[in-house]
């Protein structure tokens, strides 16, 4: 099982837009590999190893950029037979995602100015 739902607080906290400089916790369910990476993009790509926080559940907490912008994320699942990518649903409306052979459509987080 590979699963993330950007509309469910169990997998994305907080839901909705995030104030600049605040933290965002993302979780991913995976029973196919012990190695899951969170990939983010805010003008530069970053990879974060996700930590097991329960049976088949992985978590990473990141600080979003300190200025308003669109912040993007998806997941890389390392398997013996090759990497699997997991990203936004093909309709790009968020919620439950999809597996991709190559670069996935990323999930979007709106980072806003809290002032």
Residues of each region from the PLM?
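The feature marks proteins involved in alpha-glucan
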Residues: 1-21, 44-115
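Structural beta-strand segments of beta-rich domains
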Residues: 22-26
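Short proline/glycine-enriched turn/loop motifs at strand-loop junctions of beta-rich domains
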Residues: 29-35
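Conserved aromatic beta-strand anchor motif in extracellular beta-sandwich/beta-rich domains
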Residues: 36-42
């Amino acid at each position: 099982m590979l699963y993330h739902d950007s509309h469910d607080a169990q997998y994305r906290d907080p839901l909705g837009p995030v104030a600049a400089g605040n933290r965002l916790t993302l979780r991913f369910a995976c029973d196919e590999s012990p190695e899951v990476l969170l990939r983010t993009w805010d003008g530069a790509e970053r990879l974060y190893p996700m930590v097991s926080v329960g049976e088949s559940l992985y978590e990473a907490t990141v600080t979003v950029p300190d200025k308003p912008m669109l912040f993007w994320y998806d997941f890389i699942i390392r398997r013996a037979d090759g990497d699997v990518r997991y990203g936004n649903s093909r309709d790009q409306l968020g919620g439950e995602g999809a597996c991709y052979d190559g670069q996935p459509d990323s999930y979007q987080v709106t980072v806003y100015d809290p002032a």
